[in-house]
Design a protein with these regions (language model features):
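Short secondary-structure boundary segments
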Residues: 23, 50, 97, 118-119, ...
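Conserved beta-strand positions in the central sheet of alpha/beta enzyme cores
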Residues: 45-47, 77, 94, 137, ...
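Glycine-rich, proline-tolerant flexible connector loops at the mouths of alpha/beta enzymes
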Residues: 45-57, 140-147
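Glycine-rich phosphate-binding active-site loops on the catalytic face of alpha/beta enzymes
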Residues: 19, 97-104, 135-148, 180-210
Length: 217
């Protein structure tokens, strides 16, 4: 079983931000998006989604995008493409489904981060953690764009955060969801948030302010 933790009498630390990009094909577009976002607030990690391309092109994109992200103190994780993460200098990969997670663990651990998403059940989440995943994510949309009800997502996040030591990432589809997900160690800001018409800096600053307000409530 995944490691369970005893009940805590201390306040839970404020959740940190985890940015999810839209599918990017151009390193300059990534810089234009991530540079202002990472300067606006403390960000723990960036989940980089890449537009389809051949392997060499993908590696070159990651190699260009990784250093500025890492220089800001954020981990760069690649969505899928576990085999490219180490070769391109990323900090790890985020995989969807327990089978993909377990395969990535064999090739990336212990040097790199392996995150687990697309977990259909509590059992899958516990299995991912037991297998060695560094975090589990709840609430992200499936390939068809569907996600569980928000109430179910919040319940799953609160259950996990209360019981297990492995961190969880709660996926916020909108800024309004952030305040309801603060039990998680990390809040993932969806591509629609990061691509806010006000600009990435304003969106990330807004998200950080909401987290700060919840921590003081």
């Amino acid at each position: 079983m995944a490691t369970r933790q005893p009940p805590s009498t201390t306040a839970r630390p404020t959740a940190r931000l985890y940015l999810v990009t839209p599918a990017l094909a151009d390193p300059q577009a990534a810089a234009d998006l991530l540079g202002p976002a990472l300067a606006a607030a403390d960000v723990a990690a960036v989940l980089l989604r890449l537009a389809p391309a051949d392997e060499r092109t993908l590696i070159n994109r990651i190699k260009e995008i990784a250093p500025p992200v890492q220089a800001r103190g954020a981990a760069l994780l690649i969505d899928g493409h576990a085999g490219l993460a180490a070769r391109a200098g990323a900090d790890g990969a985020h995989l969807t489904g327990i089978a993909a997670v377990q395969e990535a663990l064999r090739s990336l651990k212990p040097e790199r981060i392996v995150g687990a998403g697309g977990l259909a059940s509590r059992h899958d989440a516990m299995l991912a953690a037991e297998s060695g995943a560094d975090y589990v994510m709840f609430g992200e949309p499936d390939p068809a764009g569907q996600r569980p009800s928000f109430e179910a997502i919040r319940e799953r996040v609160e259950w996990w955060a209360e019981v297990f030591e492995i961190p969880c990432v709660a996926y916020a589809a909108s800024l309004a969801e952030i305040g309801e997900l603060v039990a998680a160690e990390f809040i993932a800001l969806s591509p629609s948030i990061v691509s806010d018409p006000r600009g990435p800096a304003a969106a990330v600053a807004d998200a950080a302010a909401r987290l700060s307000a919840e921590s003081l409530a």
